[in-house]
Regions:
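Acidic, glycine-anchored loop motifs typical of Ca2+
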Residues: 139-148, 166, 177-179, 187, ...
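Predominantly extracellular/luminal cell-surface or secreted proteins
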Residues: 134-138
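Sec/Tat signal peptide C-region and signal peptidase I cleavage site
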Residues: 16-20
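Positively charged n-region of N-terminal signal peptides that target proteins for export
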Residues: 1-5
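A domain-level signal for the mature, folded cores of soluble proteins
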Residues: 21-129, 154-339
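Short, solvent-exposed secondary-structure capping/transition elements
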Residues: 121-125, 141-152
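Bacterial N-terminal signal peptides
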Residues: 8-15
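Cellulosome-associated attachment modules in secreted, modular CAZymes
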Residues: 338-399
Length: 399
């Protein structure tokens, strides 16, 4: 009896120790706004009048991890409890861990899970609904994702088919309007349901509709959204779907190269896909891929916030719109020591000297060098990079 009591006590202590460490799974949802789509208001559930705070709580329950006691009285890590849909192009979620994610040079830093899979017939395609990842450093230290965002430049970032600063606006529908069924597709019961307009460079794609299908009867407009319109701006990838049947019955969404959520089957260190070649997997995401708004690579020693948005504006017949799904996330090295951030070390070489002054001056003149630290260039922390930062940097050197 005493032996069993001791074993139970040790088990409890080990469980508490595990919980006390930095957790590898997502722990916080800061923001969520889906674009209209067939899974909106069901992933997660939402009804008219729901407050956004309650929606964020439901999203946390769906994609943030936790520990639960299993049948043997042990605390078991649940890191992929459910899934959410981001809807059509632009829908996004902003998440974080209970610690900053450290940029480990040359390594994959974190994973965001989707539900992509490969077709047994088409090896480089199947279900691929790519989402772009952005990261942010909490420069002002207020614990909120209100600092600049940096896109993780995936394989398609520099493609001539990728549109940056793409903007789309969706217009709230009249749910009681007369429906317009698609004469060529009986599954589409209203092909003028939710109107959208955009600044697409393709004249044929400036405007269109989110269709309503016969499989999902609820409203496709996010019920917690305020106002009559929803607007999103970001990078947009080219469409990736093909009707391989030629008659609308079999659609294949082809994988993008790398660097996108819900694009390929995911590498999962806690449940590895031993039956898949690592070359066809989404290995994860590197903070080293971060670029600024002008596409210049930047060095972020760590990040506090992660944002995922649906990167394509595409409709696939009876399958409906292409909508990125998010099913949780993990930090590959949650207990990595936080790097020392030296004030004024704008080029990240560990030393504050005249080369940092030169970098800040060039930054002010619009000449941003590859690999600069976008947080450190604002030496005095006033949110503006100007001559006062040069003065502050010189004072640091002279100390």
């Amino acid at each position: 009896m005493k032996k069993n009591t001791i074993l139970l006590a040790l088990s409890a202590l080990m469980s508490l120790s595990a919980v006390a460490e930095n957790q590898p799974f997502l722990t916080k949802v800061y923001d969520f706004m889906s674009a209209p789509g067939q899974f909106v208001n069901t992933m997660p559930d939402a009804e008219a009048g729901d407050a956004k705070e309650s929606i964020l709580k439901r999203v946390e329950e769906a994609i943030c991890g936790r520990y639960e006691e299993n049948d043997w009285g042990q605390m078991e890590m649940i890191y992929k409890p459910g899934m959410i849909s981001l809807g059509s192009y632009g829908g996004y979620v902003v998440v974080g861990f209970d610690h900053p994610v450290v940029n480990v040079k040359g390594d994959y830093d974190f994973q965001i899970f989707g539900n992509a899979f490969l077709s047994s017939q088409y090896g480089s395609g199947g279900s691929s609904e790519p989402g772009i990842v952005m990261v942010s450093y909490d420069a002002n230290g207020n614990g909120l994702p209100d600092d600049p965002w940096y896109e993780l430049a995936g394989s398609e970032y520099n493609s001539p088919k990728t549109q940056h600063n793409y903007t789309i606006t969706y217009y709230k529908p009249d749910e009681n309007k007369v429906k317009t069924p698609d004469p060529n597709n009986k599954s589409i019961i209203d092909n003028t349901y939710i109107r959208w307009t955009s600044n697409d460079v393709n004249p044929d794609s400036i405007s269109g509709y989110v269709y309503k299908n016969s499989f999902h009867a609820q409203s496709y407009w996010p019920q917690w959204a305020e106002g009559e319109t929803i607007t999103f701006t970001g990078s947009k990838l080219c469409n990736n779907a093909t009707d391989v049947s030629g008659k609308g019955t079999y659609w294949v969404q082809w994988n993008k190269g790398w660097g996108y959520v819900d694009n390929r089957p995911d590498y999962d260190p806690y449940s590895p896909h031993t039956d898949l070649d690592s070359a066809v997997m989404n290995r994860g995401f590197k903070i080293d891929w971060a670029v600024d708004a002008n596409g210049v690579p930047v060095h972020l020693p760590m990040v506090h916030f992660i944002k995922v948005h649906n990167a394509v504006n595409q409709y696939c017949g009876w399958l409906g719109e292409t909508s990125t799904e998010v099913a949780g996330g993990i930090d590959f090295h949650p207990n990595q020591a936080l790097p020392e951030v030296t004030a004024g070390d704008t080029n990240g070489d560990g030393v504050v000297d005249v080369s940092d002054v030169t970098l800040v001056i060039n930054f002010i003149l619009g000449q941003k060098p590859i690999g600069y630290n976008p947080v450190a260039v604002d030496v005095n922390g006033d949110g503006i990079v100007d001559v006062s930062d040069v003065t502050s940097l010189i004072n640091l050197i002279l100390k």
